[in-house]
């Protein structure tokens, strides 16, 4: 059986890791040993933060809805309760967008919610 030399595969593997580490600061971007660790850590952060992103955006939407509804005299919890009672099925993402970009439409939604809460 002939001897297998690993130079080509090792070079390819190193190139792949260094390509993933492109743009990293200092030796993390150009020394294989350090770049390999940095790429693995970056992958862990990416995996974790893809899940965290969903929570962070939901928090942002709720904060925006809360701020807009407080300007119109309701807390977020009152608004959320009223919107459920009013049967308005708009998700938080859309409500936050409406609250930021179309204040008149959001005010209309809040009026409907207030009417349902008063009834």
From Swiss-Prot:
InterPro entries given in the database record: Ribosomal_bL20, RIBOSOMAL_L20_CS, Ribosomal_protein_bL20_C
- rRNA-binding listed as a keyword: yes
Coiled-coil intervals, chain numbering: none
**GO molecular-function annotation terms?**
rRNA binding; structural constituent of ribosome
- Which keywords does this chain's UniProt record carry? Ribonucleoprotein, Ribosomal protein, RNA-binding, rRNA-binding
State the Gene Ontology BP annotations. ribosomal large subunit assembly; translation
Return the SUPFAM superfamilies for the record. Answer: Ribosomal protein L20
What GO cellular component term, any one, is given? Answer: ribonucleoprotein complex
Which family is annotated? Belongs to the bacterial ribosomal protein bL20 family.
Q: Please report the name of this protein according to its UniProt entry.
A: Large ribosomal subunit protein bL20
Q: Lineage in the entry?
A: Bacteria, Pseudomonadati, Pseudomonadota, Betaproteobacteria, Burkholderiales
Gene responsible for this protein: rplT
């Amino acid at each position: 059986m002939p001897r297998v030399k690993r130079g080509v595969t090792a070079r390819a593997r190193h190139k792949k890791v260094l390509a993933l580490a492109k743009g990293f600061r200092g030796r993390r971007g150009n020394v294989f040993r350090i770049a390999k660790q940095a790429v693995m850590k970056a992958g862990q952060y990416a995996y974790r933060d893809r899940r965290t992103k969903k929570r962070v955006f939901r928090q942002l939407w709720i904060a925006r809805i809360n701020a807009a509804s407080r300007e119109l005299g309701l807390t977020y919890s009152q608004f959320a309760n009223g919107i459920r009672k009013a049967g308005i099925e708009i998700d938080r993402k859309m409500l936050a967008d409406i609250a930021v970009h179309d204040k008149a439409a959001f005010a209309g939604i809040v009026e409907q919610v207030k009417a349902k809460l008063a009834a």
